[in-house]
Each structure stands twice: as C-alpha cells, then as structure tokens.
C-alpha cells in the first residue's frame, strides 16, 4: 500500500503525468452567451458558424470555469478479487491513487464511490493528499468477495451535479449508462480470464455467490467460454462506441499510468 502511494505520487507530481490531461483541466471556461463582435477585438474569437448564420460577426462570451468535481465509482463485484499477476482490486487501488492525485494537482475536488445495490462507501469531496490516501485505503482494504452490484448506481450518480465520472469495473454485466456526467469507462481485466489454460477437472469457488463449482476446464469448455466472453465484450464495445463514451481496457499486468495518460490527453 505504501509503495503504491509513493509510486503514484511520483508519477503525478514528478511531472510525468500529463501536461496534457485535458479531462482535469477542462477548457478553463464556461459558456455564457453569444454577442456581436466589437471592432478591435481579437478576430480569433469570432465564431464563424454563428456569424454565417446571422450574416455578421459574432463571438461567444465565456466565464472562468470553476473547479471540477471528479468522482471515481467502483462497481463492486467478487470477480474483482482475481488476478494472475496481481488482483484486479489492487490495480483499481492504483488507478484511484493516480486519478486522485491528478485531481488535486489541478485543484479539483475528488470523491470515491464503491457501489453494490446501494452506495457502501462514498467519501466526502477532498482536495488534500490525506483525503486521497484515505480513499485509496478504502479500496485497498475493501472485501469484494461475495459482492455484486445492480444498475441502480445510474440513478444514484445522476442525483449529483454534473461532474467528471470514472466508472471502474470488469463489466461482465453490461449496464445502460444513461448518465448526465462526462463519463470515462475503465474496464479492468486479467489476461487469464480471457485466455484461460487447460486445467482438466477442477473445483472452483464462485467469487460472487461463494458457492463451490466442480467443472472440467478442457479445451472444448475453454473455447466455449472464450467465445462467450468475446461476444459479450464486443457488444459492450459497440455500445460504448455508439454512445461515444471514452474508455480504456486495462489488464492487471499493465501499468495503468500509460493507459490513463493516453485516455485523458
């Protein structure tokens, strides 16, 4: 845990993370109104589409943008307590650290939500390093085994004012994301889940129901499983693309820093 915090802070505050993290900087301004261009103003401010419509030059007026609200929502599931390189839940802890420190670096408020069939953890918005460390600890120490979420999280999140939302899970369930927030989907997986090895007959524990399962992980069973996962994942990708959600799939063997930097630039 301590190593995770130190590593994340070094990447964020050591100037490695994103001089171009536009998600955290916003565009610096809020749109207020349209008005006619005044002679002598910077011509770069002219909105040419609107000017063409009204046949005279117009500019958009903006106000300085207030601080952003950053919400990280982890969709709780027992399947997050799995990993061949490291647990998916440990990867999520690192992601929360990176996003949290990035938020306060740009003087924004950060809060963490862990959701099952109701919010089980929802931290107060913070702009302090201690607040971020506390949020990371809540994820790191959380017991995901035997847990699962339902789709009521959408209504819960829509109760809050418009924010930048990071939705984190392994998405074996595919919710309809009718969210009013600027939403980024972080899809957490382990390579073994999508490409398991043959193990023959084996006893497993369902991480959601905690029931014991006796199964045969032979070649045919694995091929069926892979096809089913590929089919559902393809459907989810098509949905995210259709609805224009920005998303990144991050595996447990990967460094999330680079995936996040690419997503948020």
Regions found by a protein language model. Name each.
Residues 73, 167-169, 185-188:
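Conserved beta-strand segments of the P-loop GTPase G domain that flank and frequently precede/overlap
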Residues 128-163, 173-174, 190:
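Von Willebrand factor
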Residues 1-123, 164-166, 241:
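An amphipathic, basic-hydrophobic helix/alpha-beta surface used to engage anionic
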Residues 168-172, 252:
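Structural motif
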Residues 1-25, 33, 159-162, 177-265:
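Von Willebrand factor type A / integrin I
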Residues 79-80, 172-176, 192-193:
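Short acidic, S/G/P-rich loop/turn micro-motifs used as interaction or catalytic elements
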